[in-house]
Amino acid sequence: MARTVNCIKLGREAEGLDFPPYPGPLGQRIFEHVSKEAWQQWIKMQTMIINENRLNLVDAKHRKYLAEQVEKHFFGEGADQIQGYVPPAA
């Protein structure tokens, strides 16, 4: 039986991640409170953030910025918006 979590992003019970997706306490917090579905949404957002901001993940400052964005996305006011990006109409 799949592990379920009360997903903080979706606001409902959903299938949980199989393992912490990020190192340290932040990864454990994500593991305990974020669903697979919400994590996949983050992966898409993360890709846009990396590409549009031309982040180089070898650079410690860029990794720190991305870590701040993942924390804001799930546990804060939301990640920074991509300049010029307009979400598709539902």
Curated annotation (Swiss-Prot):
The keyword Zinc-finger does not apply. GO terms for biological process: cellular response to oxidative stress. GO terms for cellular component: cytosol. Keywords: Iron. GO terms for molecular function: iron ion binding. The keyword Iron applies. SUPFAM superfamilies: YggX-like. PANTHER family: FE(2+)-TRAFFICKING PROTEIN-RELATED. NCBIfam families: PRK05408.1. Could be a mediator in iron transactions between iron acquisition and iron-requiring processes, such as synthesis and/or repair of Fe-S clusters in biosynthetic enzymes. Belongs to the Fe(2+)-trafficking protein family. This is Probable Fe(2+)-trafficking protein. It comes from Dechloromonas aromatica (strain RCB).
